[in-house]
Each structure stands twice: as structure tokens, then as C-alpha cells.
């Protein structure tokens, strides 16, 4: 979505396909870092973005045993926003979609699922998709697959994946947040255990890290 916004802002005709009817996927990336916020400033979106509901994290703290340790402090960064912003991914994507829609070269098609690639002289030259209105074909000089770890576009293009593996995984859950809960402690580390907490306003988004 961000790439589509930036390209359309530069005058490039862009078509973005989203297979779902909305962006409501829980437990996705909700962190918007100071470097990204700086880009938002550079393209004129920062003030509008900061008016949207979000949480700000100026530092990252860990609870290790009985000790609280600050492991990152963003107050010294040479950026306008010296914090990580937390905003549900669906809200951020909707925000970018609204910003992009102001450009006549930005086209977002919801409920459009990629089913194939168009080929020309051995190169990808567009996509084929299914929509409620019927099949859709889009000719394109550039096709970008931003459809996740199980990318349909990547599979259709027969691109190989180098799996580096990971020694751990995370169990995600949500826990109600009480008014008297402590401040933005982002993680707790014990003997062989790691718990990550993300403040989502009225609840905690929690990741319990487990070995694979």
C-alpha cells in the first residue's frame, strides 16, 4: 500500500489488488517506527496520521527477573517523532488507502484475488484475478507481490525461497487491560521464558515465545 501511494504520488499509474473485502486481520504488524514516521512527514502525511488513534512508545523496557531495564530510548533520534507508534494494521492501511485515493493514478480493487500471471516474451507483463464481477486482467510493466509468506504471486512466478529457519515461534493471545496496569512495559524475560506485551488501548496483545 505504501509503495502504491509513493508511486502514484510520483505520477505512476498504480493498481493495488486486495483479495479480501477489508483489511481486518488481527495480530499483524502494528509498529510504525521513527524512520517510517519521518517518511510520512516528508510526503506530507504525518500530521494527519498523528490525529488518528494510536499509542506512542518513546522507549522500550524489559522486565528481567525483578529488574526493569530500558533497552532502547528514542529521545535522542534526529527525527520529528522520537517514538514508535502503535496503530492496528487495518487502520494504517485504511489511512494509506484514503491518502492514495486523492491521486487519480491510484486504483485500489478490493475482493480481487490474483489467480495467474500474464507473460510476454518470458517476462511477467501483468496479472489475472477473480472478482465478484468476474475475471480481471491488468497489464503492467512491473508486478509486485506483497502477499505474505505464502505468496501466491511468488509461487506463480516460480521464485525460489531460501528458508533460513527460526529457532522459536510465538503464541499470540489477548488479555484485557485494566486501568491500574503498569505502563508500557514491552517485554518480560524469565528463566527460559519470554513474554511480549503490546498496548492496544483496552487490551494487551501478548506473544509468548516458545522453541520450535
Q: Where does each model-flagged region fall?
A:
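Glycine-rich FAD pyrophosphate-binding loop
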Residues: 6-28
